[in-house]
A protein has these predicted regions:
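Structural recognition of alpha->loop->beta junctions
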Residues: 103-120, 280-288, 346-359
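Radical SAM [4Fe-4S] cluster-binding motif and immediate context
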Residues: 161, 166-328, 348
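Radical SAM enzyme core and accessory elements
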Residues: 2-8, 30-31, 35, 50-60, ...
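Glycine-rich beta-alpha loop elements in corrinoid/cobalamin-binding modules
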Residues: 25-159, 367
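Cofactor-binding loop segments of dinucleotide-utilizing enzymes, especially the Rossmann-like FAD-
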Residues: 8, 41, 93-95, 238, ...
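Residue-level recognition of beta-strand->loop/alpha-helix junctions
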Residues: 7, 38-42, 204, 331-333, ...
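Flexible glycine/acidic-rich beta-alpha junction loops that bind and position SAM and/or redox cofactors
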Residues: 12-13, 101, 195, 245, ...
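A short, glycine/small-residue-rich beta-strand->loop->alpha-helix junction that serves as a flexible
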Residues: 10-20, 66-71
Length: 464
């Protein structure tokens, strides 16, 4: 059975890294004896990407629809695939596909694998290999007589160590490295979150149960990365420190096994309780920590249902800064009734606490509190605006829009920041500064493209 997995063409502003999720599915398919192929079309135009997909016939084509700004292209693929190969099954999965399956099922997709997908994907392939029906499988959605059927959710994986060990042979890693200027990959070491932040969809995708790979397994993946002569690894978990003892055991094992790849991670402001954990981070090679403070206003923090305080973040930043670990604080502005003073509080707090910081404008992401009442559902033009500081929920939309761009101008024109992006000693640290310029450039480029699209649509409507 021939199976193609696709990372879709996407209007993204962010760096391009290999898809860990599709790598898992690719390796699962290989273990079952399927002829698996994987193609990354992230930076390829829709037309060129479709040409690659249609270059041969497959039994199953799986399109990852993880981000809302990738949905417009994902919504087109199945129709175009079936025009040439009507017998090919078109399936999808990922965050957006899980939370808004109607966007894909009503656009010619046969099945959606929703939520955590590895077990369901394996069961799906096994059924198809023996020409058995798949409609009763847990974890899938499909259309029946024009209505969406959503089967019972698949049980969560209890042991993440059972996931396939990373194998990068299907990726031309040198292309990723050349684009970023750094031999860098990201890893997933945990899933799930016990919290329920208002703007987040993590629990809708991965559940409330926090699960993690064992320290031994993560160190094994670090060793694989070290054999590839990588210069930096970033752990892409929502909060790598939710189980602090597991983090400590991992750091100690890195030290004991003499693994020397510089690395970074994302954590919550109150997750590390023991001060000695910070010392272990330094000794194990951690050079950067991303922290989601979200707002410098306690009122808004509570409305976001954040499980920590501004004081927790101050304490964390102080402990990291004292040990020379680079801090990357993240904030969100644009809450519905946020005042100018509150918006400025967040900006100036980030400037004060973090050498690197990033601000997002609050978006109505699928699965968040703000999605259900958002008027842009199903609108591909609105979807393309996600991730580019253009989808704004607040009453005073112009304020976060303008302030975002003013602060970005001063942030990126800072000569100290430019110097650090060019000459910081550590490659991982230098990359952390430089990638923000890459994202800013792409954001500006994508905004210009979207403005042109919007203007053309306006002219078409005006001229009838």
């Amino acid at each position: 059975m021939n199976v193609l997995l696709v990372v879709p063409s996407t209007d993204t502003c962010y760096e391009r890294v290999p898809s860990m999720g599709l790598m898992n599915l690719y390796l699962i398919g290989k273990e079952l004896g399927c002829n698996m192929e994987l193609v990354d079309l992230t930076e390829v135009s829709y037309g060129k990407g479709l040409k690659k997909i249609l270059s041969k016939q497959y039994d199953i084509i799986g399109i990852s629809c993880n981000f809302t700004n990738s949905a417009p292209n994902c919504m087109r693929y199945a129709k175009d695939i079936k025009e040439k190969y009507p017998d090919t099954l078109a399936i999808s999965g990922g965050n957006h596909a899980t939370l808004v399956p109607e966007d894909l099922l009503f656009n010619n997709y046969d099945f959606i694998i929703y939520g955590e997908g590895e077990i369901t994907f394996k069961n799906f392939l096994e059924r198809r290999l023996f020409n058995k029906a798949v409609e009763d499988l847990k974890g899938i959605c499909y259309l029946k007589e024009g209505k969406i059927v959503k089967n019972k959710r698949q049980d969560l994986m209890e042991c993440l160590d059972s996931l396939p060990v990373n194998d990068y042979s299907e990726f031309n890693l040198e292309l990723y490295f050349k684009r970023s200027g750094l031999r860098y990959i990201s890893l997933e070491t945990s899933r799930g979150c016990p919290y329920n932040c208002a703007f987040c969809s993590t629990v809708r995708m991965w559940g409330h149960q926090y699960r993690h790979k064992s320290p031994k397994r993560v160190v094994q993946e670090f060793k694989i990365a070290q054999e590839l002569n990588l210069e930096f690894i970033f752990i892409e978990d929502d909060d790598t420190a939710l189980d602090e003892q597991n983090l400590r055991d991992f750091c100690q094992l890195l030290i004991d096994e003499n693994v020397s790849v510089p690395w970074g991670m994302g954590i919550g402001s109150a997750s590390i309780k023991e001060e000695s954990t910070f010392d272990l981070l330094v000794r194990s090679g951690c050079v950067k920590v991303n922290v989601n403070i979200e707002s410098a206003n306690q009122r808004i923090m509570e409305l976001y249902r954040k499980p920590y305080s501004i004081e927790d973040n101050r304490r964390l930043c102080w402990n990291l800064r004292k040990r020379g670990i680079l801090i990357h604080n993240h904030g969100i502005v644009g809450f519905q009734d946020e005042t100018i003073r509150e918006t400025l509080n967040t900006y100036f707090y980030l400037i004060k606490t973090s050498p690197i910081w990033h601000v997002s404008i609050l978006e109505p992401r699928p699965g968040s509190d703000y999605w259900e009442n958002w008027e842009g559902q199903g609108d591909v033009f609105q979807y393309r605006l996600f991730g580019k500081a253009n989808v704004i929920l607040g009453k005073h939309k112009i304020i976060p829009y303008v302030l975002y761009r003013i602060f970005a101008l001063f942030y990126f024109s800072n000569p100290i920041r430019i110097w650090r992006a060019l000459y910081s000693k550590g490659k991982g640290v230098r990359y952390s500064y430089r990638i923000q310029y890459f994202v800013a450039y792409n954001t500006l480029k994508q905004n210009i493209i979207n403005y042109i699209r919007h203007f053309n649509l306006f002219l078409i409507k005006r001229n009838g």
